[in-house]
């Protein structure tokens, strides 16, 4: 796996699924392929994206700044600086300085990542802030190792949180989660179906599913009533794909 492929994988792992994730993936691919060279426009676009947390925007801004060639004197962006200040905690800053000194001795991406993984997310963000604000310099490879270590920690925390939700025994949370997933799947079906004639059936199924979820929420239904809703939708989607001559069995 190439270095930039690895960076793209880690960065995308912390972004919530949805159209915005696909858009960011495209931007990263373009940047890494050297196709997008307007850092100013890229940062302005990133700043105005909804949904993303300030830290995620800070990490993306840091990656773009590292990989898009730009003039030396280009102004640093406030939204990135604020996100990478370790919540203003002096402990984070102290640890960030210690980490920075260790990173200065590292030569490789993987070496930097290994060193960084033993620090807290706050310290890692502060260390990125040091480098972003030009208070310290490391090689691009080492800086990207720091990025990936930070993303790995965030993704681990997200995974723990998702797992807790998936394994919760609270029937109300499970019920709502199934309805949200069914609704999201229906939305994806509508986007994939597009405007072809054969798509009418898939669109109809998706539309009915969304109306059903809306009705269930409006009148309040028994928590078990949502069981299998998403799976039924996915079966319909796969049947539609089969008729279209597409074989994709990887949705479950």
Curated annotation (Swiss-Prot):
Q: Where is this motif: Nuclear localization signal?
A: 101-105
Enumerate the residue ranges of region (Membrane-binding).
1-164
What GO terms describe the biological role, i.e. biological process, of this protein? viral budding from plasma membrane
Annotated region RNP-binding: the residues are 165-252
Listed SMART domains? Flu_M1_C
Per the UniProt record, one Pfam family is: Flu_M1_C
Cite the Gene3D superfamilies for this sequence. Answer: 1.10.10.180, 1.20.91.10
Family annotation (InterPro entries): Flu_matrix_M1, Flu_matrix_M1_C, Flu_matrix_M1_N, Flu_matrix_M1_N_sub1, Flu_matrix_M1_N_sub2, INFV_M1
Q: Which residues, by range, are in coiled-coil regions?
A: none
Membrane topology term reads:
Peripheral membrane protein
| Cellular location(s) | Virion membrane; Host nucleus
- GO molecular function list: RNA binding; structural constituent of virion
GO cellular component, as recorded? host cell nucleus; membrane; virion membrane
What are the protein's UniProt keywords? Answer: Host nucleus, Membrane, RNA-binding, Viral matrix protein, Virion
Query: Which HAMAP family is this protein grouped with?
Result: INFV_M1
Which family would the database say this protein is a member of? Belongs to the influenza viruses Matrix protein M1 family.
Q: How does it assemble?
A: Homodimer and homomultimer. Interacts with NEP. Binds ribonucleocapsid by both interacting with genomic RNA and NP protein. May interact with HA and NA. Cannot bind NP without genomic RNA.
Q: Quote the function comment for this protein.
A: Plays critical roles in virus replication, from virus entry and uncoating to assembly and budding of the virus particle. M1 binding to ribonucleocapsids (RNPs) in nucleus seems to inhibit viral transcription. Interaction of viral NEP with M1-RNP is thought to promote nuclear export of the complex, which is targeted to the virion assembly site at the apical plasma membrane in polarized epithelial cells. Interactions with NA and HA may bring M1, a non-raft-associated protein, into lipid rafts. Forms a continuous shell on the inner side of the lipid bilayer in virion, where it binds the RNP. Determines the virion's shape: spherical or filamentous. Clinical isolates of influenza are characterized by the presence of significant proportion of filamentous virions, whereas after multiple passage on eggs or cell culture, virions have only spherical morphology. Filamentous virions are thought to be important to infect neighboring cells, and spherical virions more suited to spread through aerosol between hosts organisms.
Miscellaneous comment: Most abundant protein in virion. When expressed alone can form virus-like particles in transfected cells.
The name under which this protein is listed is Matrix protein 1
Task: State the organism named in the record.
Answer: Influenza A virus (strain A/Chicken/Hong Kong/37.4/2002 H5N1 genotype X2)
Q: Which gene encodes it?
A: M
